[in-house]
């Protein structure tokens, strides 16, 4: 996002947010009732205390004149009554705070759950066009910011507005003239408040954006710190982080600076109100129009009038941050999803594994086609190797087969049915995958292998590990299958990680296998063991193997040679070597 960009739709975002919490409107109504009740009890007290002040001043004057004394009993009753009102006000405030906190946490819980579910339905293109840190920032920072703002802004807004109304009513009962003088400060306060809001709004949005950028950079640097050190890129990373951090600093400073202006401005305006009330009150008291206690109560009301106006200003700033955060979360929730279910889906039961590519055309951007005309027919149980230089489109073909992306033209058929006619989840259950990048999670080795099929028994997990030639090294580890992998998965080697992911794929027992550089991260000895296990595993299953080490796919039934998105050669190893073409050059180059 460009620096200084305003929120796209502040009013619309606030409207969406309040519609989102509509499920809890009964609780919000109760919060409003208790907030207003707390305000009423609080607003009544100054006038009641004014009576005590009047009684005290009259008692002193009578005592000086020798006509009586101070009526402490009457004053004591007033003070006890006020104490009761304040206790009720605090009790009501506690109840509304308790309920509102519960509502806020439920909203945040629901939103996190919906975001988590949404992420599972998002297309691969969404994640490949954004950093992980930026996506995570919306789930953590933005939802937390929204929750904090929601918890404080609703109750404070209700309390502030009801206080202003209540105070003005009570002031009118004392002196309409003094009320008019006091209320004249409100337009000044509102104009100053709107000026500050207008200035700060865009910076709050920018601040939230760059928090996401910071998280993304930190995640990338932390995840790739070995590569950064190996290439001596610490200074470059530091410079890039400094630039992003500098932008965040400036936007945060400006937003907080304008936000901080609110209180001193409102204090200045409030002090003007005090001066005006003191002068007009003194003049009215001299004329005998009002009593001393009324002036004391009125001054309290003036203070109570400026304070909620300040609170409204603070709430507005809070709502700016809340809206900026909520807007980013709603943007994620409103992103286009993958179509998970189709009408009259084809069943995946009894899938044999016949795969046909019919003139497939694809580009990550519609104006940059990388696969121009891909056609191939794979019979059930055949082993298909896809080879070619980097960028030829090998991995892209796998993504299309799994429907991580949909083709721009042509079709991919599974057992004669267009893969778009299957429910996406059921289609992906057909495929077992071992990717270039190993993905394991914090937990035991047994749990990581069982991820391939959650209902598998311990014996089945161990059998899969043996088939992947992982049983020996697992048994030698402290705790064996119950050894806990740490959060960074650094307590086993890269080759061992690869073996575990292969064991997971074996356990899943899918009819079609996809091995994307499955042996590229292991040493030659381990590669031979894995290759023997893979040969046994692939018997009777349609298998797609992507490998740079051409020696590993010599026994493939079909080898598809890709270059610049097209198949330029196909056949088995002997046929392609006899052609003495591009494949032969690739193969010979690895042995030269």
Task: Walk through the language-model features, giving the residues of each.
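Alpha-helical segments in transporter systems
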Residues: 15-18, 26-51, 78, 82, ...
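Short intracellular "coupling" helices and adjacent cytoplasmic loop segments at the cytosolic face
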Residues: 2-5, 105, 113-137, 141-143, ...
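Transmembrane helices of ABC transporter permease
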Residues: 23, 27-40, 51, 85, ...
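Juxtamembrane loop-to-helix connectors within ABC transporter transmembrane domains
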Residues: 13, 21, 100, 120-164, ...
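An intracellular "coupling" helix at the cytosolic face of ABC transporter transmembrane type-1 domains
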Residues: 23-26, 124-125, 143-150, 154, ...
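Helix-loop-helix
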Residues: 170-184, 254-327, 332-333
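Transmembrane helix-loop-helix hairpins at lipid-water interfaces of multipass membrane proteins
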Residues: 28-92, 173-177, 288-292
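ABC-type nucleotide-binding domain
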Residues: 341-342, 348-592
């Amino acid at each position: 996002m460009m620096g200084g960009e305003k929120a796209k739709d502040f009013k619309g975002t606030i409207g969406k947010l309040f519609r989102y919490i509509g499920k809890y409107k009964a609780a919000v109504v109760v919060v409003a009732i208790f907030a207003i009740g707390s305000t009423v009890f609080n607003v009544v007290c100054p006038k009641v205390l004014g009576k005590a002040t009047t009684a005290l001043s009259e008692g002193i004057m009578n005592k000086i004149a020798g006509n009586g004394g101070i009526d402490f009993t009457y004053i004591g009753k007033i003070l006890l009554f006020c104490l009761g009102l304040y206790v009720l006000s605090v009790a009501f405030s506690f109840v509304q705070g308790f309920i509102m906190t519960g509502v806020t946490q439920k909203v945040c819980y629901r939103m996190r759950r919906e975001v988590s579910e949404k992420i599972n339905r998002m297309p691969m293109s969404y994640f490949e066009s954004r950093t992980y840190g930026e996506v995570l920032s919306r789930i953590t920072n933005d939802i937390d910011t929204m929750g904090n703002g929601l918890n404080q802004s609703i109750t404070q807004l209700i309390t502030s507005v009801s206080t202003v109304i209540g105070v003005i009513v009570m002031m009118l009962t004392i002196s309409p003239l003094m009320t008019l003088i006091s209320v004249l400060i409100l337009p000044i306060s509102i104009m100053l408040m709107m000026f500050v809001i207008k200035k700060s709004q865009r910076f709050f949005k920018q601040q939230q954006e760059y928090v996401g950028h910071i998280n993304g950079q930190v995640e990338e640097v932390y995840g790739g710190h070995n590569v950064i050190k190996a290439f001596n890129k610490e200074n470059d990373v530091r410079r890039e982080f400094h630039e992003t951090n500098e932008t965040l600093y400036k936007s945060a400073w400006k937003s907080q600076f304008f936000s901080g202006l609110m209180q001193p401005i409102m204090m200045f305006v409030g002090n003007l109100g005090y001066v005006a009330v003191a002068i007009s009150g003194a003049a009215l008291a001299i004329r005998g129009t009002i009593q001393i206690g009324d002036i004391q109560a009125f001054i309290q009301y003036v203070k109570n009038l400026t304070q909620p106006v300040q609170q409204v200003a603070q709430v507005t700033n809070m709502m700016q941050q809340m809206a900026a955060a909520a807007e980013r979360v709603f943007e994620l929730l409103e992103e286009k999803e993958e179509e998970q279910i189709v009408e009259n889906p084809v069943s995946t039961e009894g899938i044999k594994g016949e795969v046909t590519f019919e003139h497939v055309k694809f580009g990550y951007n519609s104006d940059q086609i990388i696969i121009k005309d891909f056609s191939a027919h794979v019979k059930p149980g055949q082993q298909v190797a896809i080879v070619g230089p980097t960028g030829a489109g090998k991995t892209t073909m796998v993504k299309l087969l799994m429907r991580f992306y949909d083709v721009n033209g042509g079709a991919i058929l599974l057992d004669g049915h267009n893969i778009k006619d299957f429910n996406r989840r059921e289609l992906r259950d057909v495929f077992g995958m071992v990717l270039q990048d190993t993905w394991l999670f914090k937990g035991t080795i047994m749990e990581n292998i069982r991820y391939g099929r959650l209902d598998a028994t311990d014996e089945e997990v161990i059998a899969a590990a043996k088939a992947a030639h992982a049983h020996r090294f697992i048994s030698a580890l402290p705790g064996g299958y119950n050894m806990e992998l740490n959060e960074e998965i650094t307590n086993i080697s890269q080759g061992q990680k690869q073996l575990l992911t292969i064991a997971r794929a074996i356990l899943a027992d899918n009819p079609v296998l996809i091995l994307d550089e499955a042996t590229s991260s292991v040493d030659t000895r381990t590669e031979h063991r894995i290759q023997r296990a893979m040969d046994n595993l692939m018997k009777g299953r349609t298998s797609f193997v992507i490998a740079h080490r051409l020696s590993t796919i010599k026994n493939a039934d079909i080898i598809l040679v890709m270059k610049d998105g097209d198949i330029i050669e196909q056949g088995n190893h002997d046929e392609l070597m006899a052609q003495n073409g591009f494949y032969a050059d690739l193969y010979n180059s690895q042995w030269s």
